[in-house]
Amino acid sequence: MLLSSACTVSASEPDPIITGPAPKPLAPCAWWYGIGDTPSPWEIKLAARHYDVVVLNAWETAAMRKLHELNPKVKVLVYKDFSSTRNYPGAVEGDRDAQYLPTGIGYFAAERTQPEWFAIDTLKQRIEWRGYPKHWQMTVWDPAYQKAWADAVVAEVLREGWDGVLADNDFSSLKYYSSAVIAGTADAAGSDRLLREGLDGMLALTGDALEKSGKMLVPNVSESQLTPGRWAAHSRYAGAMEENFGLRGDDGTGELITFKGNQFKEQRAQAALGESWLLLVTHTKSDKEERVGYASAALLAGPHTCWTRAHPDYKNPYWSMYQDARLGEAVETANRLPSGVWTRRFSGGWVAVNPTKLSVLVTPPPGLVTLRGEAVPAQLDLPPADAFVLVNGPKQR
């Protein structure tokens, strides 16, 4: 009876009014995760010309303002870490916190006024991140920490004029930083669950506050393929960042981890909606990784899908030859073939990605060439965890 009544009401409602054109599925734009060094004047000029989004450290306010002056359309986000406080030189100056922090809460501020915000293990020791000296895990599940972090960061964004925040370490597991079990939890799984739930709360509190102020929140979401719905939930404000995009997993299968679980499906839905940013990073040690990263990003083509290759130190701005490919606009959705290969046709070319562990024979559309202008055979052997990026050949007269 209730179902029938609901259907009657729904049927009487007018069709939704379309107020604007559908978002254009454009080839990936470029962005710069510029947190490894102070940008030089020529890098700032380059960034203003080439990048849609730039992320800088909190103390780079002059660079941020220059970017806005050179290109008012570029989005400049400030780097802030959700999960740690830090006491290495630069984050602290002697026995006090620096004026501009890579985190939301300063080390000495927490040490002197809220020491309970430092997470401790079952031996009551503070948790320092392995491989990252003087990075200390914080109690992201504590409502008081969450509020203090959000209040401080939102105030700084508004005061300095940033477009928003890139919130790092929105992670799913502590294991990449420490083997510690957090006090009050029974095991590593319990610790991870506590952290995930805490970060859910931090995201909501900070995201709501920034959104109300007309500012952006883009978290760096990791391991979202392990938890269905996590990417969609954590990209719901201004988008999300994926720092290990298009790379092979470490499980020994040789497959691309990006395509596992529900993450890629959620990213496709976000890109198709076209309302928020997908900021994708591929750490490239070879041409193959660069090719796979770009082609995988092209499968997610949309008005706010940006990709970059990078070195883990993030000291330099990067540009890829694939970003000069001029793929144009996608003319179809990304298609998954029975073989497991994904393909997508663009107005200026075609991409194919093989995320599987087996080679696959693919048939590209006619009239394509490599980026070097070389002719392409009717069929191509696409190796495992590899990709093709092909462009339209010269028009026949």
Language-model features: locations:
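Glycan-processing catalytic domains of CAZymes
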Residues: 13-397
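Bacterial N-terminal signal peptides
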Residues: 1-6
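Boundary at the C-terminal end of the N-terminal hydrophobic targeting segment
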Residues: 9-11
